[in-house]
């Protein structure tokens, strides 16, 4: 199996390269970039070392068409331009950017501030929230990998929304991410002195992941209303914690709630539900493809609290991309991902 990564000099691309280099079914993994040619990936990431196949190639559609699968770990706009031609040539495409996540091009243009991909390909793209879309992922030619915040938030909300247990207008999401979620490009906001010993809220009511979350919630329950969603940058490298609050329609016990989640995710190899009174921490999924979920119910307020944690570069990006890649190729979804988190 021959695969290529476009955009391997970013954090998600580098993590994807690490996973695919060790994947049992991948014989060759090449790397491409729009701006460099003939430079070894170790120039950007010394930890890669002198790995064969890690020399960057400039984008070339005919060269890319010879691969079995191509991964886009690129900024918005790149896959929207290049992916359609690869799909037309029979190449499986897994896109880690947001270019194909939103079905309505006008919504994409409003939230991303750029031209949307062709409507026909937005329609063909399969949203790769693996645990809730396996059958469609298996048949996908163009796979849109979910964003990091949506992955943590949607996995945390799915059982409640699908079973219609919460008020449709009551969802509040308080999400926090490590600095790698902001990408590798240098900027004042991610300088050490700006983020160290500091917590910052950003993109208040304006994060591009809001319509992605609402789109999926709406497919599960057509009566869903807009959510309140806030994001914070915290001084750590990896990890996302999505703390979710919602008003229940009728009282239930915490044990019943946990049983619902355990039943919902009984076939999910990478979702782990905590026992009553236990809540996950980001360090407990570090470097893994796991999503850990803790639950609480407040009888005084009639609100449920869901705490969902992931590694933003793994389950929130490269790990979930490989999980979807596995299904698209007809393999067990856990191939190349069966390892515990790194701790401490």
Swiss-Prot record:
It holds the Pfam family Semialdhyde_dh. GO terms for molecular function: N-acetyl-gamma-glutamyl-phosphate reductase activity; NAD binding; NADP+ binding. The active site is at residue 148. It catalyses: N-acetyl-L-glutamate 5-semialdehyde + phosphate + NADP(+) = N-acetyl-L-glutamyl 5-phosphate + NADPH + H(+). It is found in: Cytoplasm. The keyword Oxidoreductase applies. PROSITE patterns: ARGC. Its main location: cytoplasm. One of its GO terms (biological process) is L-arginine biosynthetic process. It comes from the Bacteria. Signal peptide: none annotated. Keywords: Amino-acid biosynthesis, Arginine biosynthesis, Cytoplasm, NADP, Oxidoreductase. One of its GO terms (cellular component) is cytoplasm. InterPro entries: AGPR_AS, AGPR_type-1, NAD(P)-bd_dom_sf, NAGSA_dehydrogenase, Semialdehyde_DH_NAD-bd. Disulfide bonds: none annotated. Pathway: Amino-acid biosynthesis; L-arginine biosynthesis; N(2)-acetyl-L-ornithine from L-glutamate: step 3/4. Belongs to the NAGSA dehydrogenase family. Type 1 subfamily. Catalyzes the NADPH-dependent reduction of N-acetyl-5-glutamyl phosphate to yield N-acetyl-L-glutamate 5-semialdehyde. NCBIfam families: argC (TIGR01850). This is N-acetyl-gamma-glutamyl-phosphate reductase. It comes from Geobacillus thermodenitrificans (strain NG80-2).
């Amino acid at each position: 199996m021959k695969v290529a990564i476009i955009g391997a000099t970013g954090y998600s691309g580098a993590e994807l390269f690490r996973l695919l280099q060790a994947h049992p079914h991948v014989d060759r993994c090449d790397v491409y970039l729009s701006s460099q040619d003939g430079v070894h990936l170790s120039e950007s990431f010394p930890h890669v070392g002198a790995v064969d196949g890690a020399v960057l190639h400039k984008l070339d559609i005919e060269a890319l068409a010879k691969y079995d699968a191509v991964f886009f770990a690129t900024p918005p706009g790149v896959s929207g331009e290049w992916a359609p031609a690869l799909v037309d040539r029979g190449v499986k495409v897994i896109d880690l950017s947001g270019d194909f996540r939103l079905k309505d091009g006008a919504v994409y243009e409003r939230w991303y501030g750029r031209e949307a991909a062709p409507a026909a390909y937005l329609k063909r793209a399969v949203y790769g929230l693996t645990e809730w879309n396996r059958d469609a992922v298996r048949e996908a030619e163009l796979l849109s990998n979910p964003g990091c915040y949506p992955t943590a938030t949607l996995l945390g909300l799915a059982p409640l929304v699908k079973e219609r247990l919460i008020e449709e207008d009551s969802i509040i999401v308080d999400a926090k991410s490590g600095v790698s979620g902001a990408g590798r490009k240098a900027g004042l906001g991610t300088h050490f002195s700006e983020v160290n010993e500091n917590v910052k809220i950003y993109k208040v009511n304006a994060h591009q992941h809001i319509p992605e979350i609402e789109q999926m919630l709406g497919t599960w329950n057509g009566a869903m209303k807009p959510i309140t969603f806030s994001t914070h940058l915290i001084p750590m490298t990896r990890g996302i914690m999505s703390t979710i609050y919602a008003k229940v329609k009728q009282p239930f016990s915490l044990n019943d709630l946990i049983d619902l989640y355990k039943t919902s995710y009984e076939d999910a190899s990478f979702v782990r539900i905590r026992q009553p009174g236990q809540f996950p921490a980001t360090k407990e999924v570090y470097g893994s493809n796991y999503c850990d979920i803790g639950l609480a119910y407040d009888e005084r307020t009639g609100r449920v609290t869901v705490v969902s944690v992931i590694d933003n570069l793994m389950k929130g990006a490269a790990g979930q991309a490989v999980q979807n890649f596995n299904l698209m190729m007809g393999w067990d979804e856990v191939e190349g991902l069966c390892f515990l988190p790194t701790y401490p």
